[in-house]
Amino acid sequence: MESWLFLALVLVVALVGKNMSLIIATGVVMALKLIPFASKWLPVIQAKGINWGVTVISVAILIPVATGQIGFKDLINTFKSPAGWIAILAGIAVAILSRYGVDQLAAVPQVTVALVLGTIIGVVVFKGVAAGPVIASGMTYLVITLFNLHF
């Protein structure tokens, strides 16, 4: 019963904050809880969901390459600007930090509660986005803005 109340609270917060991603995610989880045999799938989704999400985001990021909007010229130009190097370094830093984050979640599962709360607050109150790889872009944006750099 407690899980239903928690999910209902998250749904209400998502509705108040008008965050469609969180509304859909909460609705999907609640629907899965209603399906009797789906409880076997919840641990699988919990264990693999982040990787699936990263894969979907990676596909979206690669679409401009597939459509020809981004090519080798753009890749080469990346190495010619400070902003490009910052983006590369931010991507590396996030990948390294994420490895340690995954290790910490496995070692200290209680961190998950704080992460869920922080993510909900960040998404709903501050109109943030709950996505890992996008953090690298956000860090890049911050540094580029602070130093008034351009690609």
Swiss-Prot record:
Pfam families the UniProt entry points to: DUF441
Q: What is this protein called?
A: UPF0756 membrane protein lhv_0995
Principal location class: membrane
Signal sequence coordinates: none
Family statement drawn from the similarity comment of this UniProt entry: Belongs to the UPF0756 family.
- Record the organism: Lactobacillus helveticus (strain DPC 4571)
Cellular location of this protein? Cell membrane
Superkingdom per UniProt: Bacteria
The record lists the membrane-crossing segments as: 4-24, 25-45, 52-72, 78-98, 115-135
Q: Does the keyword NAD apply?
A: no
What membrane topology does the annotation report for this chain?
Multi-pass membrane protein
* Cited InterPro entries: UPF0756_TM (IPR007382)
Upper lineage: Bacteria, Bacillati, Bacillota, Bacilli, Lactobacillales
Which cellular components does GO assign to this protein?
A: plasma membrane
Q: Does the keyword Cell inner membrane apply?
A: no
Q: Which UniProt keywords apply?
A: Cell membrane, Membrane, Transmembrane, Transmembrane helix
